[in-house]
Structure formats: C-alpha cells, structure tokens
Amino acid sequence: MRNDLICLGVITSSHGISGHVKIRTFTESPEDFTSYGMLTDGTNTYKISIVSVISQNIIIAKIKNIVSRNDADLLRNKKLFIEKDKLPNLTNNDEFYHNDLIGLNVILENNKVYGNIKKIHNFGSCDIIEICLSNSKKSTMLPFTKNIFPYINIKEKYIIINLPETIGNSSDT
C-alpha cells in the first residue's frame, strides 16, 4: 500500500437489496467522508455518496455501479483510502492524522524509550494507542488522552508518555 494514502473508512456490510453499503468512517465527522473526492482501495477507485448517517462513525452509502446486494457483499471489509494531500492542512499543533502517529517512538518522561506506536484503535468510547514495548515482543494499549500522552512531536517522530501508576514502567526491568 502506498505511504501517501490515509484510510478514511471500511465497508462493514451490505445494506438492503439495492447495493447500498454500511461504512465505518474514521473522519472527525461522518458527513466529511465523501468531501475529499473519489476513494480507493489501492487498486480500484469508488465514487461514493452518503445516503444517511446512522451514528457518530457509521454511514449508509451508495457506490457508483454497485447495484445489488451481491455486488455490495463483495466489498465487505474493504478499506477505503484518500491521498493525504487531498485532506485539509492541519494548522493547530494539537491536530494530526492518526496515520502520522504510527511508528512514533514512545518516550517516558525520563527520556527512556518505552516502545513505538503500532496501531490506533477505536472501540467506541475513545481512541486507544497500541504500543509495541521496546524490551519485549509484547504490546500494551492505553487510552489516547492528553494526561497520558502530554506531548507529541510529529516532525521529530516521538510522543511523550506519562504512564498511569497501574501500568508501571516495564522498561525499567
């Protein structure tokens, strides 16, 4: 997959009999999902229009040339991407795209490397950062809050972590 692509959502299922699909969006607002133009899965491009917004991150959409439930079922679990340069420029230092965080070094407040960011999840209530620990093959997941991650430096490729006492500092062992 190209490095300049940002995942905006994933098709989770078909919806109805006329080829509509249910899409889990990763945009700040679900209405923004189609604002940036045609989307791609890395091979094909799709012209998508929103039929309805179901929840904070679920939409029902129509994809051009998908006309039946069978057609829509073939797209299940397909990730949809946009070229990063089609997204708006971020002007606030506290704003960034999730994709920019993947691979950042996670640094403890004592300047020791704790690990690096493997993935960002959202199971409903908030974003969760998955960190590959530097001293093992294990990983840990922590809520992505300003209290736990007080400082992010995208240009220098690191993020500071303030570990909750219940987690402890496993990199000291």
UniProtKB/Swiss-Prot annotation:
Please state where this protein is localized.
Answer: Cytoplasm
GO molecular function term, any single one: ribosome binding
Q: Which domain of life is it from?
A: Bacteria
The task this protein performs is described as: An accessory protein needed during the final step in the assembly of 30S ribosomal subunit, possibly for assembly of the head region. Essential for efficient processing of 16S rRNA. May be needed both before and after RbfA during the maturation of 16S rRNA. It has affinity for free ribosomal 30S subunits but not for 70S ribosomes.
Q: Does the keyword Glycoprotein apply?
A: no
Q: Where is the PRC barrel domain?
A: 93-167
Question: Where do the TM regions start and end?
Answer: none
Instruction: State any GO CC term.
Output: ribosome
According to its UniProt record, what is one Pfam family this protein matches? Answer: RimM
Q: Name one GO biological process term.
A: rRNA processing
- Which family would the database say this protein is a member of? Belongs to the RimM family.
Name of protein:
Ribosome maturation factor RimM
**Subunit field text:** Binds ribosomal protein uS19.
- Please give the record's comment on domains: The PRC barrel domain binds ribosomal protein uS19.
Sorted UniProt keywords: Chaperone, Cytoplasm, Ribosome biogenesis, rRNA processing
